């Protein structure tokens, strides 16, 4: 996560040892966009842990047989104070938002949306929109923005080639 604070506070990170153990968070199935929608495996938030650092949501979807499930069809909805990254492994999704962005994301690409003081967006990866679409597979991670920028400017960025 980018730290956009002008004067960030220094802090000491505790050193973990093997004695500290490892917490395994099991994902749960959640319908994305309603009860008859595509299912995602949501790891965060969970009953035992709502955050890991700045990460507040972690969803994995697919591989999903789009013809059987209808694919991803998330109607317009608002976000504030967070940033989302969508990384697609298989299929196509169309992102639309109130900033005027309309961007198709393909495998290996990223969409980065900064909600700031508020943005409304939708995501669609259906056979209706992409008739040749067979499967959909990807992840979406959300981070809580730092207090200094949480109500700042909104933005959308598409990364067509992710450096490896």
Predicted regions and their residues:
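A short glycine-rich, His/Asp/Glu-containing loop-to-beta-strand
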Residues: 31-89, 138
């Amino acid at each position: 996560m980018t730290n956009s604070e002008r004067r960030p506070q220094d802090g000491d990170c505790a050193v973990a040892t093997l004695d500290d153990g490892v917490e395994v968070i099991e994902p749960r199935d959640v319908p994305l966009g309603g009860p008859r929608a595509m299912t995602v495996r949501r790891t965060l938030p969970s009953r035992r842990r709502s955050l890991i650092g700045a990460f507040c949501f972690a969803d994995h979807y697919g591989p999903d047989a789009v013809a059987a499930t209808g694919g991803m069809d998330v109607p317009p909805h608002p976000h504030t104070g967070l940033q989302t990254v969508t990384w697609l492994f298989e299929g196509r999704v169309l992102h639309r938002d109130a900033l005027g962005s309309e961007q198709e994301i393909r495998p290996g690409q990223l969409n980065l949306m900064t909600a700031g003081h508020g943005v409304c967006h939708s995501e669609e990866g259906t056979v209706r929109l992409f008739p040749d679409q067979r499967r959909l597979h990807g992840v979406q991670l959300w981070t809580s923005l730092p207090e200094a920028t949480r109500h700042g400017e909104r933005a959308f960025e598409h990364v067509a080639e992710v450096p490896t």
